[in-house]
C-alpha cells in the first residue's frame, strides 16, 4: 500500500491534511483479499491524521473501529505506534465532550468493514 506509506510520511512531517488524503486514497483503492491487518492499520493511521487535522468526531469513529478490529484479530498496537495513538486519543478526547465522544466511539465500534470504508472516503 504505497499510498498508506505516503500517508505515514506526511503524518510524520506534520502534514495532517495531506496524510488524510493519502489514507483515503489507499482505502478507495482496496481490493478484495487485501490483508485485514493492513487495512486495520490504514484506519488507525487515518484516525491519527484526522485527529491531527481537527476532524475529531470522524477520528473517534475510525479509531474505535480500528481498535475493535485489532481486538477481534488478537493484534496489539505495536509499542512504536503507542505515542502516536495516545496523542490522537488525547486530541479527540480534549475536543469532544463526553457524550459526543461516547456516541462517536459507539458508532465506530458498530461499523463493519464496508461501512468504515464508505464513511472514511466520504467524510
What are the functions of these language-model segments?
Residues 1-4, 8, 41, 48, ...:
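Residue register of alpha-helical TPR repeats
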Residues 2, 19-26, 59-69:
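Tetratricopeptide repeat
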Residues 5, 12, 38, 45, ...:
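"A position-specific structural signal for the A-helix of alpha-solenoid helical repeats
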Residues 13-14, 28-38, 71-79:
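Short coil/turn linkers that connect adjacent helices within long alpha-helical scaffolds
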Residues 14, 24, 49-54:
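Extracellular beta-rich repeat passengers
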Residues 55-123:
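C-terminal non-catalytic interaction modules
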Amino acid at each position: 500500500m504505497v499510498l498508506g506509506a505516503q500517508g505515514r510520511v506526511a503524518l510524520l512531517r506534520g502534514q495532517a491534511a495531506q496524510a488524510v488524503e493519502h489514507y483515503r486514497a489507499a482505502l478507495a483503492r482496496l481490493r478484495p483479499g487485501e490483508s485485514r491487518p493492513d487495512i486495520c492499520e490504514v484506519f488507525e493511521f487515518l484516525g491519527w491524521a484526522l485527529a491531527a487535522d481537527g476532524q475529531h468526531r470522524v477520528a473517534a469513529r475510525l479509531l474505535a473501529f480500528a481498535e475493535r478490529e485489532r481486538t477481534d484479530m488478537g493484534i496489539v498496537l505495536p509499542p512504536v505506534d503507542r505515542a502516536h495513538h495516545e496523542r490522537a486519543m488525547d486530541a479527540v478526547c480534549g475536543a469532544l465532550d463526553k457524550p459526543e465522544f461516547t456516541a462517536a466511539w459507539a458508532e465506530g465500534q458498530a461499523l463493519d468493514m464496508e461501512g468504515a470504508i464508505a464513511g472514511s472516503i466520504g467524510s
